[in-house]
Amino acid sequence: MKGIAYRNVPFDLNHGHQQTLVGMTTFEVIHEDAINELTQMYPLIKNLVKDDQAIIEAGFKKWAENIIANGVPHNNWDLFQADFIVKIALVLQDDQAYADGKGKQYYLDYVVNQNSIRQWSVNKLIDFGFDAKSKTWYESPGYSTTVLGLLGEFSNMLDEKAGIDLFQKCPILVDAVKNSAEYLFPNRMIAGFGDTHPGYLNTGGIDQVLKYATRHKNKNLISEMNLLKSAVAPKAPLSEIETYTSTLFYAPNVSWIAMRSGMDKQHDLMASINASLGNHQHANGISLELYGKGYVLGPDAGIGKYLYSGLDYLEYYSQMPAHNTVVVDGVSSYPVMMSQHAFKVVASYPEVTQEQPASKKLSEWKLSTEKDSELKDKISYATVKFLEPETQAQQQRTTAIVKTSAKGGYYIDVFRSKKVEGGDKTHDYFYHNLGQEMKVMDAISGQPLDMKPTEELAFAGGHLYAYSYIYDKKSAEMQNSIKTQFVTKIQDEKVVEAMDGQREITMTMWMKKDENRTIFQALSPANLEYERMPNQPYKVEEQPVLTFVARQKGEAWNHPFVAVYEPSSDTEPGDIASVDFFEPEQQGAVGILVKLKDGTTQRLVCLEDGTVES
């Protein structure tokens, strides 16, 4: 500590960004972990080092001042910084013991109430980071769910050791924990957009609220948290989890919509739709993840082998071709990490808005619709629009979930895209699916397409580096509507048992024919989002990803990408017999006819204004 008192931080002769991050012992103030041990030891040996007390405490104060001066205020860094400052404050004497008046009370007040350029007060951070209506933190799910635990742990430390009750002062800390189940797919793993490794819900936030409630003998809050913790457990019954999850949930501060038919791991569907707003986000346009039969079959690609510091992250994993989205002219992109590119909600059913971000909980929704047999009561949908900044292209995506039976259902995906000022070259519709086998067929004859090796979809021509990561490419011109099957074979008997006896899961996609369209079958780099996933069907991180691309030459607004996706398995075959398309009378609308094996036909119309009729 004597050395810290006399030490100065390194000086960057280039006056670069690193100068604003550097700590006394590390190159980033959030990694000053030595503070944890030193602040625990100092009170124990304080009486033994009385002669050095002044210089030791001067060192601690210098350390705190450097953390206040350097760092990042607008994300989880601020919280890590505040944690170190509070730990230092708690070993200092009262303010009057120091000539500058900066002691225990000064630093505690600074963390809670004061603001500087690189150290916001916890109050300001909470106001900035949480959406007041949806209660979501403004980072990708992996980071957001972790922050709930960190904030809770920090708040408990302040409450226990300094008598500052942040939970009472900021009720959103508890509300956000209560809402955290909205991140879950039916398999009880979190959505995977941005820099996320999906897994079961991090219950750190719940545990910290429980700790607080127990200390304050708040029986109601203890009961609420115990019920929530039980409900988000992987094997919790539907009656529990469906009281915490909505049919439609919209988080405007991360530009994300979750749409569910229910939370049955095996039989329900969920679509996760996101743009790029907030921290730890990717350049993904309007991206989509699709769930079925126990897995997110159509996932994001993940972070990258070396997380977000590697070249593969910079060139591929954070870019649009790694996501289920549409790339314009081969160049669509924008800054990643702290991103400002949100979508706008055009239409939805049930309706969600910034002011009313959640529809009824699934338990209520099912009670209100179980007696209705009309098709419209089996459909939920969301339409969002997005301005792709690199090419100034207007994009609109309609995603719908349609239940066909207690065990089955399908998705509709209608993606429109055009450059505002014209001059469209290409629009590339990307879809990635788990699995080891991919079959692309003519939807009418059922015969495989005659696909030839190609070097299209390349960086050559001034396109994104990400195109260079796509390989084993084959293509064919679209003559008729097509049918594509992505087959996932489960190889481990223990996983077969965990997945209700399924050995083979198939995602079937039907895509509407359009002129000037080329279909590609290819492979992409391994999915590194699910490398930590339990019950993997195969070693996901060791195998390339099955990749489907439809390239529309010219604009894709009046020639939209229209697809139907149905998940099925060897133990639960699909309900769809065939899919046809028709031209509705409404200008710009898309018509879809889904014929089921039970003889019924479902007729749906996706209008240009974003609404869906049946």
Regions found by a protein language model. Give the residues of each.
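Aromatic-lined, polymer-binding surfaces characteristic
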Residues: M1-V174
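Surface-exposed intrinsically disordered loops and tails
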Residues: Y6-G16, K104-A132, T136-Y138, S339, ...
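Carbohydrate-active enzyme catalytic cores, enriched for enzymes
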Residues: G142-L297, E585-Q586, L593-T600, V605-S614
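Acidic, glycine-rich loop-and-strand cores that form catalytic or ligand-binding grooves
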Residues: H216-T247, D492-E531
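Polysaccharide-binding surfaces and accessory modules of carbohydrate-active proteins
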Residues: F430-R517
